[in-house]
Amino acid sequence: MSDMSANEQEEGVMEASPQGGERTTKDLGIARPLRLNSGLLLGNRLAKAAMTEGLADRRGWPGPRLERLYERWARGGVGLVITGNAMVDGRYLERAGNVIIEDAGVHEALSAWSAAARKGCAALVQLSHPGRQTNRFICGQPLAPSEGPPVKVMASFSRPRAMTPLEVEATVERFVFAADACRRAGFDGVQIHAAHGYLLAQFLSPLTNRRADVWGGSLENRARLLLEIVRAVRARTGAGFTLAVKINSADFQKGGFSEEDSLEVVRWLDAEGIDLLEISGGNYESPALLLGPGLRESTVAREAYFLEFARRVRGVTRLPLMVTGGFRSAAAMEAALGEDALDLVGLARPLALDPDFPARLLSGEVERSEVQPLRVKGKALGMLAEASWFGDQMDRIADGLDPDPGISPYGSIARYLTWQTARGLRHRATYRPPQTVQRG
C-alpha cells in the first residue's frame, strides 16, 4: 500500500484546487485516490495493467526477477499494479515462464512477490486459464469449451478437445484455490481474466462454446463458469479481499461475443458485487489491444480504444471501471476521468519502457508517454514483435537494468521464439502435476 496514510490520501480529494497559478498535483484527476467497495484504497487513478512476463522459475514460482520488476513498478507512482496472468493449472500455460498457483508449495515465493509488489501501492494477481490458447510446444492437446479448429496464428497451436463437465467444475476449484493462496500470501486481491480469448472468454463466445449442457447455449449458460468462479472466490476469500474481473467489450469476430453480450454479463457481475471491472477487447485471432480494433482516426486521437464502450457500461452499472488500451497523454486521461467515463486508467506498454512514467506524469515532469507502435510488416509478425520487444524491456528491468528503446524488434522476435520453444518443450517434458489437486 501507499506510504501515505489513508486519511491523508482521502483528505487530498476534498481540498479545493488553488485559484490561478500553476497547476498542482492535486488539480489532476489522475492524482485523486479511489476507494473500492472492498475497502481497498488506491493512492491515485493510474494502474499498471497486466502484461505477460514469463519470468517464473522452472517450477512456475515467482522469484527475485519478478520481485525486482514489480518493486520497480510499485515505486514508480501507480496506485495499483496487476500482475501478468498467473496460471491456475500447470498443464496449460499461456506461455513458458508463467507463474503457476496450484499447490501450497508456492506460498513462500508468492509471499515474497507480494511484499515487493506492494511497496508503495496496492497489488492484485491476475488469474487465468488459457484454454485453446495454449501453444503446441507446451501442450499437444489444449482444452476448450468445445472441440474445434486450432487458433490460427503462425501454426503455433494444436486442435483443442472439449472439456468434460468434471473438468469444468474442477476449473472453478482451481481458481478458488489460487485466489485464496494469493490472499494468504498478502496480495490485496485478484483479477479474474475473462478477456483476450482465454478460457473464460472462450466460454462466453458462441464461436468457441457450442456445448449443449448447462455450460453452453444461451448467454446465461455461457457466462455460468465465470459467475460461478466469482461466487466461489468471494465465498472463500471474503468481502475485504478485492475481486476484480477483466472482460472484453467484444471479441471483434463475426458471430462472436458482442457488445450487447458484454453489457449483459456486466449487469450480472454487478449483481455479484465485484469490486472492479476492467474493459479490454480482442483475442489472439483478432488482437484489438495490440493492433487496434479497426480503429477510427478519432479513436486513435482520443487514445482510449474502448472508451465508447465504457460510456455504455456506465449506463448499466456504477462499478469502479478501469479502461486499458491506448492511453498515452495526461490530457487524454484527464478528459476520460473528467467526463466520468472511467475511474481508473490502465497503462501497460508505457510502463515497460518507462517504469517511472506515472510518477513523472503526476509531478508534471512529462505530459505523455513516448511509446510508439513498432514498425514491423505483417499482422501476425507485428503482434509477435510487440509482445517480444516489450518483453525484452521487462527482462531488463527484472535484471536490474534500465529499458533499452534501441533493441531491434526482429532480434526480440528471434530471442522470444527460441526461448519459448525450448522452455515450452522442457516444461512439457518435465512438468508433473501435484499428486493431490488442491481444492478451494
What are these regions (language model features)?
Residues 2-440:
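Flavin-dependent oxidoreductase catalytic cores
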